[in-house]
Amino acid sequence: MGKEKTHVNVVVIGHVDSGKSTTTGHLIYKCGGIDKRTIEKFEKEAAELGKGSFKYAWVLDKLKAERERGITIDIALWKFETPKYNVTVIDAPGHRDFIKNMITGTSQADCAILIIAGGTGEFEAGISKDGQTREHALLAFTLGVRQLIVAINKMDTTKWSQDRYNEIVKEVSGFIKKIGFNPKSVPFVPISGWHGDNMLDESTNMPWFKGWNKETKAGSKTGKTLLEAIDAIEPPVRPSDKPLRLPLQDVYKIGGIGTVPVGRVETGTIKAGMVVNFAPAAVTTEVKSVEMHHETLTEGLPGDNVGFNVKNVSVKDIRRGNVCSDSKNDPAKESASFTAQVIILNHPGQISAGYAPVLDCHTAHIACKFSELIEKIDRRSEKMEDSPKFVKSGDSAIVKMVPSKPMCVEAYTDYPPLGRFAVRDMRQTVAVGVIKAVEKVDKAGKVTKAAAKASKK
């Protein structure tokens, strides 16, 4: 057994008819998780139903249908491999689900693959002012996805036209640049998800295509196929390499043990003997022990739901929504204010400065005031407007926000799980956002005896 491949998550986005299912199905079918038995079963059913042209979308339709009926689908079916990576496909089915999943972080994508239909009229429909193509790409960027691959699909229906391909590349480069992606770092690949051209193997139908290239910090990369473009994704920084961030879900008082905060390690690691700090409570103390499922852990890793015992801290000092961090390694601090990119999803009216809804960010649930609308992008006209008077559904805006009581959040680029939030009002999610920058409060807090002793060691 060699070393296990790095895992990456990709989200496949694009207009409903762009051929997302066929393309994704093709990759999964050829490089991945569907075992031969399942495929034979599907092929037999397809033939019986007269879908003899059994193509890859059918695989996906079957998987989706089974998933919707509540049959638990072996999630391995949504995986495929490239030479370097184990890839998990995050399906972006319903628009609302997609947004919700991306925000709650059930699915943090490392890269988005934007599938564009190259056929005459189709591309224009997808990209028109209200097309999903634009909106999905804007959402992916707003939600922190910084790597993009553009696959121009259905090239077979354009008679493999180089002119059509170039026209689309030019148009798409323009709109993704407006959103914030750098087109030079985005591979563009002309494909046919149906026939398989440039999917895994170089197409013989497009001799004019000399290959894609993308510029990265590490230098430029080139390739011919969609699979190679996926293999050229920059590897994500694993959360265990970052400093500790552990948002508290609850704090218990356990007889004979003392105060036990509980929460999920989002980044970094936690272990006994560590001197931790809680923000915004500004309490510093030593971790005596770490447990998961009633067993002692030597260290808690990202994704672990742990309980840990802290000395000399009362249950009154810390609470749900506080963030635990390593006092010696970029400790978390209270946020005085922060600027965020916010997308208004469904709000019946106009939102102007002064609006103060509740924000759900990690485990914190706190009202925050939209203190200043800095700029907005109208999603239909794509116009930028500085200091707008108001924003409405469909707008994307940069907003300065001020929490109504002490809160600890982080910039999305530093600590993704602490940098995205949902805005709740009228019992629904009216907006979602990603934090760009945080103004932090420096304040001396309470240091327990245990912490003082531990830090002298």
UniProtKB/Swiss-Prot annotation:
Record keywords, A-Z: Cytoplasm, Elongation factor, GTP-binding, Methylation, Nucleotide-binding, Protein biosynthesis
Keyword Membrane recorded: no
Subcellular location: Cytoplasm
Positions of region (G3): 91-94
Region G1: start-end pairs: 14-21
Residue list for modification N6-methyllysine: K3, K30, K316, K389
N6,N6-dimethyllysine: modified positions: K3, K316
GO molecular function, a single term: GTPase activity
Chain positions with N,N,N-trimethylglycine modification: G2
Residues reported in the UniProt entry to bind GTP: 14-21, 91-95, 153-156
PTM-bearing positions, type N6,N6,N6-trimethyllysine: K79
GO CC terms of this entry: cytoplasm
Pfam families: GTP-eEF1A_C, GTP_EFTU, GTP_EFTU_D2
Homology family: Belongs to the TRAFAC class translation factor GTPase superfamily. Classic translation factor GTPase family. EF-Tu/EF-1A subfamily.
Its job: This protein promotes the GTP-dependent binding of aminoacyl-tRNA to the A-site of ribosomes during protein biosynthesis.
PANTHER family: TRANSLATION FACTOR
NCBIfam families, A to Z: EF-1_alpha, PRK12317.1
Protein name, UniProt field: Elongation factor 1-alpha
